[in-house]
Amino acid sequence: MGTPIKASLLALFLFFLLSPTAFSVSNGGLLRVGLKKRKVDRLDQLRAHGVHMLGNARKDFGFRRTLSDSGSGIVALTNDRDTAYYGEIGIGTPPQNFAVIFDTGSSDLWVPSTKCDTSLACVIHPRYDSGDSSTYKGNGTTASIQYGTGAIVGFYSQDSVEVGDLVVEHQDFIETTEEDDTVFLKSEFDGILGLGFQEISAGKAVPVWYNMVNQGLVEEAVFSFWLNRNVDEEEGGELVFGGVDPNHFRGNHTYVPVTRKGYWQFEMGDVLIGDKSSGFCAGGCAAIADSGTSFFAGPTAIITQINQAIGAKGVLNQQCKTLVGQYGKNMIQMLTSEVQPDKICSHMKLCTFDGAHDVRSMIESVVDKNNDKSSGGEICTFCEMALVRMQNEIKRNETEDNIINHVNEVCDQLPTSSAESIVDCNGISSMPNIAFTIGSKLFEVTPEQYIYKVGEGEAATCISGFTALDIMSPQGPIWILGDMFMGPYHTVFDYGKLRVGFAEAV
């Protein structure tokens, strides 16, 4: 997450306290750190987590095993309604516990510091106190990681880090002194533990995983993820350091070499919609296995093609049309009466701001999900845009029905490629499978796996898991394969042989 890859959706996480932690010792004296799942507002969670982890500075992830008597670590993961997976670590002596996302898309470890006393996001989460640790060593090098419009700022320190039953000594990490409240205030997790390569560290710090290997704490230079996508089950998933758990996959893994150190990046082939080639990536695309991202993200052209095939419509477009349907006729009546146009939206309590914005700023406000909400946010912007079009149509003496139709056309023209897209929940069973060619093998995901269903019955909302992200590289367009892919496919990150492997998860 602290790197040049970026996502477009960013919103608040709903804040719930972490459940009590359960400890148990099993096979070979391995310590299992169990966490409970919370039932939370899944729509807000996926908006928040889904792509704040695809950032100009990036982040997220978590898993399990059946290993030998020693040389491995297991961290039980909490499934936060299919939008984030996190587990518990300890920093210092005695250990101070933190819930962290295990993120293969970044490489730094950071947690809030007791020196962070002005950001609410720090204050409401556990904070690391160097004065309470006998193994703390100062560093002081400043660090910052950008997350879209949010960021963390802090400084490096060094201490022991406990992950499962493994204790990593002399680990550099960031104590945050500032955290963006919009991004982190209501997050379930306290910090992030990066599992990417050192090349993308904000301060070129040696990552936790490197030190596990260098200090001989694991038998194999391998870690693996199993993500349980069944939100109703207690076990959220497991991250295994030092090996894999054969209980959580079927058959053999298909391995592909890492093509660019930094991210866990590899070469991917054609993308199929149903059983038909999309024509994209047939000549090769770069792909990144990223536990810190909920969605699939890829080039706009293919994402648009997929979303059209599944009948997806932009959330912004639908919200705009809903406003027009509910308030359009009243707005027209007010425009033809004596109410000042720039007062109508506030009069209808759709804006808290009395005044007018120019059209350009309105459009930018809609596209920028992190715009200043002091004037009422997106709904206010939709209202102001609709009024501008209505005034023009009234001058042309258009009928009320024609005016409404023309304003709906404006709603259809709002940019949607980087925003959430919704689908008809009743049509999921008829949607096509999407397949990715990796190592000459097809890896399919079903509609049930790439659609988020929020709520039940008539109140249900179904959201496409495909979002646009245009990043060009020397290797070609880049895809991000997040938790929606790593759920169906058990994933192995082989540091020793610099390869990534996928097998059907069970």
Swiss-Prot record:
Enzyme class: hydrolase
Residues the record marks as carrying a glycan: 139, 252, 397
Keywords tagged on the record: Aspartyl protease, Cell wall, Disulfide bond, Endoplasmic reticulum, Extracellular matrix, Glycoprotein, Hydrolase, Membrane, Microsome, Protease, Secreted, Signal, Vacuole, Zymogen
Propeptide: 25-70
A single GO BP: lipid metabolic process
Subcellular locations according to the entry: Microsome membrane; Protein storage vacuole; Secreted, Cell wall; Secreted, Extracellular space, Extracellular matrix
Record text on subunit structure and interactions: Heterodimer of a light chain and a heavy chain. An intermediate form is produced first, and undergoes proteolytic processing to remove the internal plant-specific insert (PSI) and the propeptide.
Protein name, as recorded: Procardosin-B
Source organism of the structure: Cynara cardunculus (Cardoon)
Gene for this chain: cardB
